[in-house]
From Swiss-Prot:
This is Probable succinate transporter subunit YjjB. GO terms for biological process: succinate transport. Signal peptide: none annotated. Pfam families: ThrE_2. It comes from Pectobacterium atrosepticum (strain SCRI 1043 / ATCC BAA-672) (Erwinia carotovora subsp. atroseptica). The gene is yjjB. It is a multi-pass membrane protein. Disulfide bonds: none annotated. NCBIfam families: PRK09917.1 (NF007391). Involved in succinate export with YjjP. Both proteins are required for export.
Length: 156
C-alpha cells in the first residue's frame, strides 16, 4: 500500500487536473482561479481513486468526490469572490463516465446492425445504467453542498 499507491494517486491527480484546467479555459474562467480549478479537479479525482481503491464502487465514490468538490468550491468561492460553479463544473468533468457511455452507444449500434442478442443487450444495459448512475451521482453530489450550506431555514 505504500509508495506504489502514493505514486498512482499522484499520477491520477495530475492527469485529472489537465482536463479540469482545459475545460476551465474553455469555459472562460478568470486567470486567477485557473490553478484552483486544476487543483480541485485533481483532488476530486484523487478522492474517487482512493475510495475505489479501498473497496467503494465507482458510483458511490463519484458521489463522495462530487460532494467534496462542492464543499471546497463553495469555500474557495467565498475566499476568491467568485461563483462556486467557476471551480466545481470544470473540476467534476474529468469524472464523467466516457468509457461506459461509449461502450453502451457502441452496443446500441451493434444491436441495430447485427440484430438482437442477449450478450449485446446485457453489455448495453450494464454500461448505460453504470454511466447514468455515475452522472446522477455527480450532479446530485455537486448540488448537495449548496443546499446544505446556503439553507436559510432550519431543517426541521
Amino acid at each position: 500500500m505504500g509508495l506504489s499507491l502514493l505514486w498512482a494517486l499522484l499520477q491520477d491527480m495530475v492527469l485529472a487536473a489537465v482536463p479540469a484546467l482545459g475545460f476551465a479555459m474553455v469555459f472562460n474562467v478568470p486567470l486567477k482561479v485557473l490553478p484552483y480549478c486544476a487543483l480541485l479537479g485533481g483532488v476530486g479525482h484523487g478522492v474517487r481513486f482512493l475510495a475505489i481503491h479501498f473497496g467503494m464502487n465507482i458510483e458511490w465514490a463519484s458521489f463522495l468526490a462530487a460532494i467534496l468538490i462542492g464543499i471546497i468550491g463553495i469555500r474557495w468561492s467565498r475566499w476568491l469572490l467568485a461563483h462556486p460553479k467557476v471551480f466545481t463544473v470544470a473540476a467534476v468533468i474529468p469524472m464523467f463516465p466516457g468509457i461506459s457511455a461509449y461502450t453502451a452507444m457502441i452496443s446500441v449500434v451493434e444491436i441495430s446492425h447485427l440484430g438482437y442478442s442477449e450478450a449485446l443487450m446485457s453489455v448495453m444495459m450494464t454500461n448505460f445504467l453504470k454511466a447514468s448512475f455515475i452522472v446522477g451521482a455527480l450532479s446530485i453530489g455537486l448540488s448537495l453542498p449548496g443546499i446544505w450550506l446556503y439553507r436559510k431555514r432550519p431543517g426541521v
